[in-house]
Curated annotation (Swiss-Prot):
It is a multi-pass membrane protein. This is Putative sugar uptake protein. Disulfide bonds: none annotated. CDD domains: GRP. Pfam families: Sugar_transport. It comes from the Bacteria. Belongs to the GRP transporter (TC 2.A.7.5) family. InterPro entries: Sugar_transport (IPR010651).
Length: 280
């Protein structure tokens, strides 16, 4: 049952990027605002069905972690439009894996034996090699630029904080979830204000992206449970199987072009990701 719960975030986080990518005339500001709104709605519904008590400290910290999540998501949406879903997601996954694995192993002490370090390191190597293979491109115009890498690396800090937060405090999932979704919504508003794109609130694409927010919100709720049941490292690695859904979806559903050799590299990379997640 714990593993099934760990796989729900992979499904939700894999699908939401495809929903956003399929909406016409959609831009990062539309996508982030729509996601924030949809996630907030899921948070409110969850709070009504499963009300949970909290205190000002836990509520405030949860809200801040949600705002950091919005930072991470803004980088993903911008990169998706610049270099495509099938390149963004593997690279983003790699950065997140490195950060969250180090946080889980060093700060939370989830690796306590030499065998755990050995197996965990092997799993991490397989997954990083896998995501690197999925990002291979022979088209010079489509190759990653340093600015794309720096953007994703910087914004991934938001994901590191958000992903590790459920393990940092003692509270149940229901207590954490609503304030985190409020934080994502507030973070989305801040993004619009800072980038001076408040006009997107009137655009159809923003409201259609609420459906991607529904998918994201369900995944986020499941992730909180998974992190508490399975530990940060295991929960995160399983959740990042979303890269399989988003990468293949970007190619076959969105229609992002890849040559035969690039497809082979992508499939090999995805297999390595699955193996790495399975042995973790």
């Amino acid at each position: 049952m714990n593993i099934l719960i760990a796989l729900i975030p992979a499904l939700g986080w894999g699908i939401f990027s495809l929903i956003a990518g399929k909406i016409k005339n959609s831009h990062p500001a539309n996508e982030l605002m729509g996601l924030g709104t949809g996630a907030l709605i899921i948070g409110i519904i969850t709070a009504i069905i499963h009300p949970a008590s909290s205190n000002i400290t836990i509520f405030s910290l949860s809200l801040i972690s949600g705002m950091f999540c919005a930072l991470g998501q803004s980088g993903q949406f911008i990169s998706m439009r610049n270099i495509g879903i099938s390149k963004t997601m593997p690279l983003s996954t790699g950065f997140q894996l490195i950060g969250n694995t180090l946080i889980g192993a060093i700060i939370f002490g989830e690796w306590t034996s030499s065998s755990q370090y050995l197996i965990g390191t092997l799993a991490l190597i397989l997954i990083i090699v896998g995501v690197s293979l999925t990002a291979i491109s022979k088209d010079k115009s489509a190759k990653l630029k340093m600015r794309d890498i720096i953007l994703l690396l910087f914004t991934s800090i938001g994901y590191w904080i958000y992903s590790s937060f459920p393990k940092a405090i003692t509270a149940n999932a229901q207590t954490l979830f609503l304030p985190q979704m409020i934080g994502i919504f507030i973070g989305s508003i801040i993004f619009l204000l800072v980038s001076r794109q408040t006009k997107v609130l009137k655009e159809k694409a923003t409201w259609l992206n609420i459906f991607s927010g529904f998918s994201y919100g369900i995944a986020a709720f499941s992730y909180i449970f998974s992190a508490q049941l399975n530990g940060v490292i295991t929960a995160f690695i399983y959740s990042q199987l979303c890269v399989i859904i988003s990468t293949l979806g970007g190619i076959f559903f969105i229609g992002e072009n890849k040559t035969k050799s690039e497809l082979i590299a992508t499939f090999v990379g995805l297999i390595l990701i699955i193996i790495g997640a399975a042995i973790q």
